Amino acid sequence: RTFLRNISLLTLGGIASQKVMASNPTRSIPATDAISSATAGKKMGLQTYSLGQELLQDMPNGLNRLAKAGYTDLEIFGYREDTGKFGDYNPKNTTFIASKDYKKMVDDAGLRISSSHLTPSLREYTKENMPKFDEFWKKATDIHAELGVSCMVQPSLPRIENEDDAKVVSEIFNRAGEITKKAGILWGYHNHSNEFKRVLKAGEKPEQNPNPWAPPKGTYIEELFLKNTDPDKVMFELDVYWAVMGQQDPVEWMENYPNRFKLLHIKDRWIIGDSGMMNFPNIFKKAYEIGILGYYVELEGDKKGRTQFEGVEKSAAYLQAAPFVK
């Protein structure tokens, strides 16, 4: 085991991690201005999942409030494949917005929709179902092109039991990326913590009494995705908080795969910078070194009696004041 060199966790003396294997991709997705350059000052993105119903209840005023806080870009969520509209994952939600209406409200607020999180409802990632996944991404791409997005990102992990499963999923990802690329849109995958679990080859069994000093068997799911997807078709959005929760150093992953991580999710336990556990100076430094296209703030977790809008605004203030954020 090797200890993290550029530690991105500040509590408990850091987390030990098995060093991920470096890749050497010969190709990469061409650079796209994912985060808007139309606004002077810092360019800050927000994943609208952070607000949920608080935004949907009054979109025009809510969007203006985000612009006033300093956000320039949105990464939206809530795409409905049955209607092609956008809403909320909350089953009680009754507000759904057509793409053209969504874009107009965002444009009127001086913001831009530059990315979107969406996932097919089909859960069986098999070779037989590949045409069905293709159809999902073709329809979704047409609708997202109306929004003018630069990126479409899948944020949910299919069921993966072994390396063969990961290879099939990677091929489905490659096909999705090929579809969106024809529309000038980057396709990406967003991690949580489960991607940093190790899986074995099909039929291989874990050791009953492993040597505690030997390297652990198996390969990280995230690493299998990186190795088995085409850099010309698939990029990755690194959620730095969930990487840390998976006992990983996000800086180390960016070092080892500098041409694959194009977007970041900047996240903390709730408000950005409040917990003191995330080493954001190191994270941003490495992100700029590898040339990320942009980042999106996302809030989850304990509200501590405050509204989500308050958390989003306080997070923006932290990033606006941070000297390490460009």
Residue ranges and their predicted role:
Residues 19-57, 64-65:
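C-terminal segment of N-terminal export signals and the immediately downstream linker at the start
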Residues 49-51, 77-79, 118-121, 157-159, ...:
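Active-site beta-loop-alpha junctions enriched in small/polar residues
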Residues 7-9, 13, 105-107, 122-235, ...:
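Active-site acidic/histidine proton-transfer and metal-coordination neighborhood
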Residues 52-55, 63, 93, 232, ...:
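Gly/Pro-rich active-site loop or hairpin
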Residues 76-101:
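Glycine-rich, proline-tolerant flexible connector loops at the mouths of alpha/beta enzymes
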Residues 34-39, 63-68, 92-114, 136-148, ...:
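Acidic (Asp/Glu)-rich catalytic clusters
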Residues 42-47, 74-76, 113-118, 152-154, ...:
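Hydrophobic faces of well-ordered beta-strands that scaffold small-molecule active sites
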Residues 1-24:
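N-terminal export signals
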